[in-house]
Amino acid sequence: MTIEFTDWPQDRAQRYRDAGYWIDQPLTEILHSRCQAQPQALAIICGERRFTYGELDTLSSILASRLAEQGLGQGDTALVQLPNVAEFYIVLFALLKAGIVPLNALFSHRRLELTAYAKQIVPKLLIASREHEVFRDDAYVQAFAEVGAAPAVTLLLGESDPAASLAHWIETPGSQPVAYAPTAADQVALFQLSGGSTGIPKLIPRTHNDYHYNARACADVCALNAHTRFLCAVPAAHNFLLSSPGALGVFHAGGCVVMAASPEPLSCFALVEQHEVNTVALVPSAVALWLQAAPAHRDKLQSLAYLQVGGAVFADSLARQVPGVLGCQLQQVFGMAEGLINYTRLDDSDEQIFTTQGRPVSPDDEIKIVDEQGVPVAPGEPGMLATRGPYTFCGYYKAPEQNASAFDAEGFYYSGDLVVLTPSGDLRVVGRIKDQINRGGEKVASEEIENLLVLHPEVTHAGLVAMPDEALGEKSCAFVVSRNPSLKAPALRRHLMELGIAEYKLPDRIRLIEAMPLTAVGKIDKKQLRHLVSVENTRTWLQTRLRQLIEDSEELDPEENLIFYGLDSLQVMKLAAELKARGIEVSFEELASTPTLASWWALVEARQKAA
């Protein structure tokens, strides 16, 4: 029995084999080849623990045999949720060896996400941590049973009962070895999670052939080798940290993965110094924190050579700081769990590295950039990204409706990204057409949060949109129509938390409005909501900026002439220039003719609306 998935057309599959991309070997070959070449080399450092490639192989084989002893194997699935610990990789290789297909949930996911995943894959096996709030007691058993997905076997990290202790199963061989085998190389190896825009993430089946090539190709582009010391500080389950090139790329090259609980700068700097880490992969929000903290700790970063940044668009202004502040080379990454991975190359020009997201890793990655009618746009013009290739999937798991809208007749996948092709042949990401918020690399689907907000008994309508943020790139703003005009934001966030969503999905800002703006066909007018966010942000900025210029501690009366607060003509000219820099065309003469905060708010709002 195998897991169903949408396969590649035969002609393309044969082409990928002929080119040597698909080698018809399971992902376990990565570990096997390392054990043959360097069994005593370090594979993982996790706190005070060290694991060689030989030990990683032995421990994962013990667990695979124990699982096979329970009757688990090919055709079965596993829901796995572990923090950044060595057990994550021991479990991964054990499941791959046993032919059990894992779905690795992020450690930030809570009851709502976990039960939704379980409902989709109906796992025979659950592996989790007592450290996580969902598994601190045994209430989770009922939660999984309620969705018809009670696992046959549950193993928990931190469990004291040997019968359910993950550590005990890893360290204690069964009474006799039991045979096990991975699924065929052209079958599903694991599920990845989409950054979906329609609620709970859709599942992405990745085969051994395509994922193996994904990791190898990325490792080659990033020049990983046996001397690579790679810091895993972003969740290990992220596709970025698993295969782009991530841990699988490091293992393929014979390097060592150093585990970090989080990307918190000071603890990571200590790990970099202690273990001579030379490569790290981070999301932009984490890089911003590193850039702030690094000047006082530069001596701890002497071994750091490469910083890979992905998961969200990296601002040019931050990118340019990396070499000078962190003392290492920047490599931008633009990829997706569905497949296509782009990198700036290590020998690219500074401008390419600072201002683009690179180009595909494979010669057979096909991309097209088209308008809404599917017509290719002119070079340098923004358009929708569509792609297909040897490691880009051909369909979401059991999702025919989504697949019909995500793929065209030629098999190109439409990612929802808006990109520009630069003269150098690199891609620059300029936006997104999906209704999704990218909060520091974590994807928040607007529809999911909107549907949960209206479950509150006092909420009639809800709309969620992105708002810009310097640290995270984007944050979320929820607009809510309520029967109770006194309803407060904390009550709505409490409501969402009680439903069991991940904390990063909580709206950063919540605003009550009298009526929800709708389009002509009755849908929420997200354009108007984004306009309201822009107006509010500009109002706040304008008031704050005026108080800086005036140097007055008093609250500003919106109707008072600003001249009487000490504002002069030069300052008004400066404000006009700053507003222009923010994309708001307002002249000095217009501001000077009606120098009140209320008038300026109205003028700026009118210009924003017109734009």
UniProtKB/Swiss-Prot annotation:
Alphabetical GO biological process terms: siderophore biosynthetic process
EC class name: ligase
Record keywords, A-Z: Ligase, Phosphopantetheine, Phosphoprotein
Reaction catalyzed: salicylate + holo-[ACP] + ATP = salicyl-[ACP] + AMP + diphosphate
EC number from the UniProt entry: 6.2.1.61
A GO molecular-function annotation: 2,3-dihydroxybenzoate--[aryl-carrier protein] ligase
Carrier domain ranges (all copies): 533-608
Function: Involved in the biosynthesis of the siderophore pseudomonine. Specifically adenylates salicylate and loads it onto its peptidyl carrier domain, via a thioester linkage to the phosphopanthetheine moiety.
Family stated for the protein in its record: Belongs to the ATP-dependent AMP-binding enzyme family.
Classification via PANTHER family: LONG-CHAIN-FATTY-ACID--COA LIGASE, SURFACTIN SYNTHASE SUBUNIT 1
Protein name: Pseudomonine synthase PmsE
Protein's gene: pmsE
